[in-house]
């Protein structure tokens, strides 16, 4: 992917520090294999095709195992590993990367490490839309026939983005909405450095959620948040794997 925006650097951040408890395995979640290849390596191979300036891989207690797996299959000096010392949530994971954002002209694509089916062309389309709309923060969404378990996207009266509401906080009417958050964000480094430190852990899990970045920045008077809606046929690409059953499903449809 040639640099569409020559004045801005492009960083891609992969959140791979999750414990993956629901996998019921001693193996880190992103090291589970989809048809013979680990999730993280599959994802890395797609990300590299975007020709970013840097790839930040946020890891936790399994730093050694995950970094070893990546280095075994991919030799690229643009990869940097960022250690999240405690599993305090996705917002904290991104906070760990802030010291590496050395200036305000870095575009950051942030995505989870457990979406092994995503294609570089899809990520490229998301980033191009971010550039075309001159966004400061872009949220990726999709309509799902079964949105159970996903955060819902709330639109304003002009059908623009309003907020993300996690399912547990949704009213019965909001649960009927099918437009959901994909967990893929594009954001300017200046916004990250301003907003991420404001995220609190005032929730039942005592974790710092990346979705709170949206709430915080949405309160800024000059915010420029845009929404990119993926076509429905991309559902398999943004499918998060959290359980063995989900892993088996992805393997069955990707052969």
Swiss-Prot record:
Q: What is its EC number?
A: 2.7.7.23
Indicate whether Nucleotidyltransferase appears among the record's keywords: yes
Entries under InterPro entries matching the protein: GlmU-like, NTP_transferase_dom, Nucleotide-diphossugar_trans
Record keywords, A-Z: Nucleotidyltransferase, Transferase
The molecular function GO annotations come to: UDP-N-acetylglucosamine diphosphorylase activity
Q: According to the UniProt record, what class of enzyme is this? A: transferase
The record's listing under SUPFAM superfamilies reads: Nucleotide-diphospho-sugar transferases (SSF53448)
Name recorded for this polypeptide = Probable UDP-N-acetylglucosamine pyrophosphorylase
């Amino acid at each position: 992917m040639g640099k569409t925006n020559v004045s801005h650097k492009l960083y891609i951040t992969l959140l791979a520090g999750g414990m993956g408890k629901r996998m019921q395995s001693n193996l880190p979640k992103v090291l589970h294999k989809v048809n013979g290849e680990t999730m993280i390596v599959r994802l890395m191979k797609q990300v590299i095709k975007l020709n970013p300036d840097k790839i930040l891989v946020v890891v936790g207690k399994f730093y050694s195992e995950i970094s070893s797996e990546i280095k075994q299959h991919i030799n690229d000096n643009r990869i940097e590993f960022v250690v999240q010392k405690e599993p305090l949530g996705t917002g904290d994971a991104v906070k760990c990367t802030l010291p590496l954002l050395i200036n305000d002209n870095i575009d950051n694509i942030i995505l989870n490490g457990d979406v092994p089916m995503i294609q570089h062309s899809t990520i490229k389309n998301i980033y191009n839309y971010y550039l075309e709309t001159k966004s400061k923060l872009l949220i990726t969404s999709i309509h799902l026939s079964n949105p159970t378990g996903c955060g819902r996207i709330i639109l304003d009266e002009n059908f623009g983005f309003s907020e993300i509401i996690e399912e547990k906080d949704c009213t019965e009417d909001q649960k009927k909405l099918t437009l959901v958050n994909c967990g893929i964000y594009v954001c300017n480094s200046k916004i990250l450095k301003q907003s991420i430190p404001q995220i609190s852990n005032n929730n039942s899990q005592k974790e710092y959620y990346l979705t709170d970045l949206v709430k915080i920045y949405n309160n800024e008077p000059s915010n420029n948040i845009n929404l990119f809606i993926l076509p429905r046929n991309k559902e398999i690409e943004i499918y998060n794997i959290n359980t063995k059953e989900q892993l088996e499903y992805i393997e069955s449809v990707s052969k």
